[in-house]
């Protein structure tokens, strides 16, 4: 309540704080005195009423006896109340006195022995406390002048005169000497005359205040105000002294600041103390209470310094919010976010019930991801706690009305292809993918939501898991059922889950950020989500061809971390590929969701190692080369989205062949190891060749091919945040490895930095032979 006002400062602020606190204490004492006076008046009134019954005694002894007892009881109660008030008053004064002593000790480090002059000169001459006669105004000296001269005396004077005499026999002696000792002499006569008058009382007008009170060094107006405060208590007792005490003082001290005459509220807003009450008087001295409402009086003419900052600021800031209900606050915050992001209209999408609901929930997630509404919506599914809100569906709906609608409907190849090329449509496609996955089957919808939640929360569900969860893939959507089957295979899922738990967590981290990439055309592919791609149910009809393609696309982008590193904004090869093929279109629809992941990953330092998704996708391709997956997945080359588009078919073919032969082997071989190793290490290490099939791939395939694939893997990995890729990869690798993969080689070679090397060894030291790359 006594928050000081004025500009911040060290010593100055302390003085202001002390002054504000003293003023609050003074106001509290005045309030207590007023309460005591009113109580005394009541008692006197009750006593005055008592005589009238006496004359009525002849009236009737019994009648008189009853009223007398009542009056006596009332009088006794009043006397008890009065005694309590007096005790409270005494306790308050004692408390103030103790506070005064504590302040003087803590801030001034001054001995409180009243009989001897304080050894201010004997303090350590550290320069900070040094008291030189040269007039240096150190913090300690200024504080001493304020605190010792005025604070203690003022508080002492607040006590009864007799008590003040006992407590402080000599004001001049009690006060510590300070730099401006030249102003002290005025006090010495007071000390000599202490027997004649109370220490706090002021001499007659013969000794004007101005001679000694204005302390040129540091006191300021506080010094002028405090003398008046000193006399205030006595002034209330002796009205004649008030005039003398207030001489030369510009503040009407007998009138407390109006701000102290208002109800107080604790900062928690739970307790309210009405103005005229003992608790209010005590609360005035506590900074834990604020005025219930701002008042222009707050500043008060008497303390202009305090007014600007006084309780008013506290009132506005603390009382309002403090009293505001939690739910109301949350709603207001959400509304504010919605307005900031212009997403107040979740009805954009034709998602129906989910659209608006998710949109309402998505504003903050969208913000976090930095996505457009559609992108945010999609990632909302993965963002922790977002799914519950229905953020993904909503975001998608909000972001792109048309695409979102598609999202709920099975995605069709043409629609996706048309929308995918467009940046905006990509997010919508990704949203659609997400929604389509949800829509593919009610069960898959519910399941996918959990999976998304898992992603967002760090509990990543392997792609295979997701596939299992969403048993009803839009088989019509998949160009290659075999690929879908491989994706669905449960055994890889379980294996991948076991192996890649930690990588998944990392993936989750990345997955939370990928939203940003959706906005970019490349982003559509960039965030291949194992869940979407791997979940046939999630793939829309348009996606059918992309089933494998998405996996391949993921692999290609994810292969080279350097690629993703080079392209902070993931170049979405899948998007480029999607325009070429109808399944690619669907893949793009799939990729937009993945693109979101890619973008987040790209921001995070795109994963530099092949993600498990990439590896698993390759393994799948190898295992299902016979199935008509469409053109080999394009390797995401540094060329970017456009180049990737041109290459996709070739790259995919190449990838297929490679994945069928060596890549698949490595994916299968490394699946168990890499899921844990690569995802974790991918963050730190970046190398164009690092992900190239981990060296084996490079050797098995042409350098260029390996590099391209590595770049693709890098993009996919970076975009997917390696998290989704890892999940999908572990699951997929076992599946694809079963049919076409050669037995897992006992030795897997990886080009890695020392840090990565350590991480790999920590997981499977004997299984991997690591080549350190400078």
From Swiss-Prot:
Bilayer-crossing regions: none
GO molecular function: beta-catenin binding; delta-catenin binding; protein kinase A binding; protein kinase C binding; transcription factor binding
Regions of compositional bias (Low complexity) in chain numbering: 637-648
Residue interval(s) of motif PDZ-binding: 771-774
Assigned keywords, A-Z: Coiled coil
Family: Belongs to the dapper family.
Subunit architecture: Can form homodimers and heterodimers with DACT1 or DACT3. Interacts with CSNK1D, PKA catalytic subunit, PKC-type kinase, CSNK2B, DVL1, DVL2, DVL3, VANGL1, VANGL2, TGFBR1, CTNNB1, CTNND2, CTNND1, LEF1, TCF7, TCF7L1 and HDAC1.
UniProt name for this protein: Dapper homolog 2
Record organism: Homo sapiens (Human)
């Amino acid at each position: 309540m006594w928050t000081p006002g004025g500009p911040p400062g060290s010593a100055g602020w302390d003085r202001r704080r002390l002054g504000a606190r003293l003023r609050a204490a003074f106001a509290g004492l005045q309030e207590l005195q007023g309460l005591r006076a009113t109580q005394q008046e009541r008692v006197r009134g009750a006593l005055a009423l008592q005589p009238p019954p006496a004359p009525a005694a002849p009236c009737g002894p019994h009648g008189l006896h009853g009223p007398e007892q009542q009056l006596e009881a009332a009088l006794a109660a009043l006397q008890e109340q009065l005694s309590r008030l007096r005790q409270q008053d005494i306790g308050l004064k004692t408390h103030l006195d103790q506070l005064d002593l504590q302040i003087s000790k803590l801030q001034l480090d001054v001995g409180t022995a009243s009989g001897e002059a304080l050894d201010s000169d004997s303090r350590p001459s550290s320069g900070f406390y040094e008291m030189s006669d040269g007039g240096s105004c150190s913090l300690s000296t200024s504080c001493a002048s304020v605190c010792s001269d005025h604070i203690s005396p003022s508080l002492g004077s607040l006590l009864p005169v007799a008590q003040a005499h006992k407590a402080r026999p000599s004001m001049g002696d009690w006060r510590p000497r300070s730099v401006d000792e030249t102003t002290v002499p005025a006090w010495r006569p007071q000390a000599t005359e202490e027997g004649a008058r109370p220490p706090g009382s002021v001499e007659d007008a013969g000794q004007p205040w101005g001679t000694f009170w204005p302390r040129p060094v540091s006191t300021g107006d506080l010094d002028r105000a405090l003398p008046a405060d000193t006399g205030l208590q006595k002034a209330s007792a002796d009205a004649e002294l008030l005039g003398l005490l207030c001489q030369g003082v510009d503040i009407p001290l007998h009138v407390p600041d109006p701000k102290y005459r208002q109800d107080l509220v604790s900062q928690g807003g739970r307790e309210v103390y009405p103005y005229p009450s003992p608790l209010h008087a005590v609360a005035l001295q506590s900074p834990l209470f604020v005025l219930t409402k701002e008042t222009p009086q707050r500043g008060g003419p008497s303390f202009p310094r305090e007014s600007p900052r006084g309780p008013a600021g506290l009132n506005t800031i603390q009382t309002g919010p403090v009293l505001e209900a939690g739910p109301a606050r949350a709603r207001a915050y959400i509304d504010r976010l919605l307005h900031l992001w212009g997403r107040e209209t979740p009805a954009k999408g034709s998602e129906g019930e989910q659209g608006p609901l998710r949109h309402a929930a998505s504003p903050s997630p969208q913000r976090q991801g930095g996505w457009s509404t559609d992108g945010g919506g999609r990632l909302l599914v993965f963002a922790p706690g977002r799914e519950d809100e229905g953020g993904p569906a909503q975001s998608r709906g909000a972001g792109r009305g048309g695409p979102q609608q598609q999202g709920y409907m099975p995605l069709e190849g043409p629609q996706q292809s048309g929308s995918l090329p467009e940046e905006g449509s990509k997010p919508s496609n990704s949203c659609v993918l997400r929604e389509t996955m949800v829509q593919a089957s009610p069960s898959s919808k519910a399941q996918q939501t959990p999976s998304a939640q898992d992603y967002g929360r760090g509990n990543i569900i392997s792609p295979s898991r997701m596939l299992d969860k969403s048993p009803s893939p839009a088989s019509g959507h998949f160009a290659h059922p075999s690929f879908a089957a491989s994706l669905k295979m449960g055994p890889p899922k379980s294996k991948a889950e076991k192996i890649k738990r930690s990588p998944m967590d990392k993936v989750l981290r990345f997955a939370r950020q990928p939203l940003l990439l959706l906005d970019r055309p490349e982003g559509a592919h960039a965030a291949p989500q194992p869940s979407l791609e791997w979940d046939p149910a999630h793939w829309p009809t348009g996606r059918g061809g992309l089933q494998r393609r998405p996996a391949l696309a993921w692999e290609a982008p994810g292969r080279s971390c350097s690629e993703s590193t080079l392209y902070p904004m993931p170049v979405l090869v899948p998007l480029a590929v999607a325009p070429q093929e109808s399944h690619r279109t669907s893949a793009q629809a799939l990729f937009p969701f993945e693109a979101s992941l890619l973008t987040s990953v790209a921001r995070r330092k795109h994963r530099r190692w092949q993600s498990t998704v990439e590896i698993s996708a390759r393994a799948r391709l190898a295992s299902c080369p016979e199935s008509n997956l469409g053109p080999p997945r394009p390797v995401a080359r540094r060329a970017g989205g456009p180049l990737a588009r041109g290459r996709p078919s070739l790259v995919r073919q190449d990838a297929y062949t490679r994945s069928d032969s060596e890549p698949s082997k490595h994916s299968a071989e490394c699946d168990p190891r890499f899921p844990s190793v690569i995802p974790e290490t991918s963050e730190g290490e970046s190398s164009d060749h690092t992900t190239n099939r981990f060296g084996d791939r490079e050797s098995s395939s042409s350098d260029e091919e390996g590099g391209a694939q590595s770049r693709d893997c890098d993009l996919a990995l970076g975009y997917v945040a390696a998290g989704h890729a890892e999940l999908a990869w572990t699951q997929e690798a076992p599946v694809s490895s079963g049919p076409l993969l050669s037995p897992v080689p006992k030795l897997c070679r990886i080009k890695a930095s020392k840090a990565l090397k350590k991480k790999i060894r920590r997981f499977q030291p004997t299984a991997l032979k690591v080549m350190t790359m400078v």
